From Swiss-Prot:
PANTHER family: MOLYBDOPTERIN SYNTHASE SULFUR CARRIER SUBUNIT. The keyword Transmembrane helix does not apply. Acts as a sulfur carrier required for molybdopterin biosynthesis. Component of the molybdopterin synthase complex that catalyzes the conversion of precursor Z into molybdopterin by mediating the incorporation of 2 sulfur atoms into precursor Z to generate a dithiolene group. In the complex, serves as sulfur donor by being thiocarboxylated (-COSH) at its C-terminus by MOCS3. After interaction with MOCS2B, the sulfur is then transferred to precursor Z to form molybdopterin. Its main location: cytoplasm. GO terms for cellular component: cytosol; molybdopterin adenylyltransferase complex; molybdopterin synthase complex. The modification 1-thioglycine is found at G84. It comes from Caenorhabditis elegans. Belongs to the MoaD family. MOCS2A subfamily. The keyword Secreted does not apply. It is found in: Cytoplasm. One of its GO terms (biological process) is Mo-molybdopterin cofactor biosynthetic process. The modification Glycyl adenylate is found at G84. The gene is moc-6. This is Molybdopterin synthase sulfur carrier subunit. Heterotetramer; composed of 2 small (MOCS2A) and 2 large (MOCS2B) subunits.
Length: 84
C-alpha cells in the first residue's frame, strides 16, 4: 500500500469537507479500485458518484485504466463541469 494525495474539487470538496486527503491504495491498481476506495472513505460522494470524474497526475482516468502509483502521484476527484 502507498499513501496518495487525493484532491477534491467543487462539489466533491463541499461534500467531503476538505480540499485534500492522503488515502492508502495498492501500488498497482486500476480505475475501479481507486473509485471504490474513494467512495468507501467518503460515502457522501455517492451523491455525485455517477457523474464524478477521476484524474491521475492531471490526466483524466477511464474505466479499465491501470496505474502504478508512486510516492508523488496525485488523484483528483472532479465533479460534473458546467458553465457556458
Amino acid at each position: 500500500m502507498i499513501s496518495i494525495k487525493v484532491l477534491f474539487f467543487g462539489e466533491a470538496c463541499q461534500l467531503v469537507g476538505k480540499r485534500e486527503e492522503a488515502i492508502d491504495f495498492p501500488e498497482e491498481t486500476d480505475y475501479e479500485e481507486i473509485r471504490k476506495t474513494i467512495l468507501e472513505n467518503y460515502p457522501a460522494l455517492q451523491k455525485i458518484e455517477k457523474v464524478m470524474m477521476l484524474a491521475v497526475d492531471q490526466e483524466y482516468a477511464n474505466p479499465g485504466d491501470r496505474f502504478e502509483l508512486v510516492r508523488f502521484t496525485e488523484i483528483a476527484v472532479i465533479p460534473p463541469l458546467s458553465g457556458g
